[in-house]
Swiss-Prot record:
HAMAP family: Ribosomal_uL5_B
Protein name as annotated: Large ribosomal subunit protein uL5
Subunit structure of this chain's protein: Part of the 50S ribosomal subunit; part of the 5S rRNA/L5/L18/L25 subcomplex. Contacts the 5S rRNA and the P site tRNA. Forms a bridge to the 30S subunit in the 70S ribosome.
Keywords: Ribonucleoprotein, Ribosomal protein, RNA-binding, rRNA-binding, tRNA-binding
Molecular function, one GO term: structural constituent of ribosome
Function statement: This is one of the proteins that bind and probably mediate the attachment of the 5S RNA into the large ribosomal subunit, where it forms part of the central protuberance. In the 70S ribosome it contacts protein S13 of the 30S subunit (bridge B1b), connecting the 2 subunits; this bridge is implicated in subunit movement. Contacts the P site tRNA; the 5S rRNA and some of its associated proteins might help stabilize positioning of ribosome-bound tRNAs.
One Gene Ontology term, aspect cellular component: ribonucleoprotein complex
Cross-referenced SUPFAM superfamilies: RL5-like
Organism field: Sinorhizobium medicae (strain WSM419) (Ensifer medicae)
A biological process from GO: translation
Pfam families hit by this protein: Ribosomal_L5, Ribosomal_L5_C
Family: Belongs to the universal ribosomal protein uL5 family.
Length: 185
């Protein structure tokens, strides 16, 4: 893939400022030890998919608009009679962002989408998994500017997982704080 001349704002900030700040804070001997963003996974589970098979397709179209990349329709791995769910039924959509699209999505998430969330008090600082990854949930997908509120017939929630190369939660928390993640105090 040819290298494009465009470099996202957050990636440029990471290279110029954030890497140096993290290296000074944790005093790494090697530059490759400095944690960086690896990928962002966005998952949209559609609970009502058992009744209407078109709902995951509609959710996938909204997710494609938000992420700028075609999502994968996720299917049920096994049948659950209580949920009227059969193996192989479409139950949601997910997309994995890397590179330029990852930094662009992160920029929109931090600066546009999260401030538009109702009653937002900050991200939970305990949502790290112990290996340097951060998970969060958004209850309404209409907080993203790509979604036209008038054309939405149903609100979808989504899970957003930010995967980093950090080895522990403290390194990942420091990295995401440098990216201006609004953590709760």
């Amino acid at each position: 893939m040819a290298k494009s001349a465009y470099e996202p704002r957050l990636k440029k900030e990471y290279v110029e400022r954030i890497r140096k700040a993290i290296q000074e804070q944790f005093s790494y001997a090697n530059e490759m030890q400095i944690p960086r963003l690896d990928k962002i996974v966005i998952n949209m589970g559609v609970g009502e998919a058992t009744g209407d098979s078109k709902k995951p397709t509609v959710a996938a179209a909204d997710l494609a608009a938000i992420a700028g990349q075609k999502p994968v329709i996720t299917r049920a791995r096994n049948s659950i009679a209580g949920f009227k769910l059969r193996e192989g039924m479409p139950i949601g959509a997910k997309v994995t962002l890397r590179g330029v699209r990852m930094y662009e999505f992160l920029d929109r998430l931090i600066n546009i989408a999260l401030p538009r969330v109702r009653d937002f008090r900050g991200l939970n600082p305990k949502s790290f998994d112990g290996r340097g990854n951060f998970a969060m949930g958004i209850k309404e997908h209409i907080v993203f500017p790509e979604i036209n509120y008038d054309k939405v017939d149903q609100m979808w929630g989504m899970d957003i997982i930010v995967c980093t190369t950090a080895t522990n939660d403290d390194e990942a928390r420091a990295l995401l704080k440098e990216f201006n993640f609004p953590f709760r105090q």
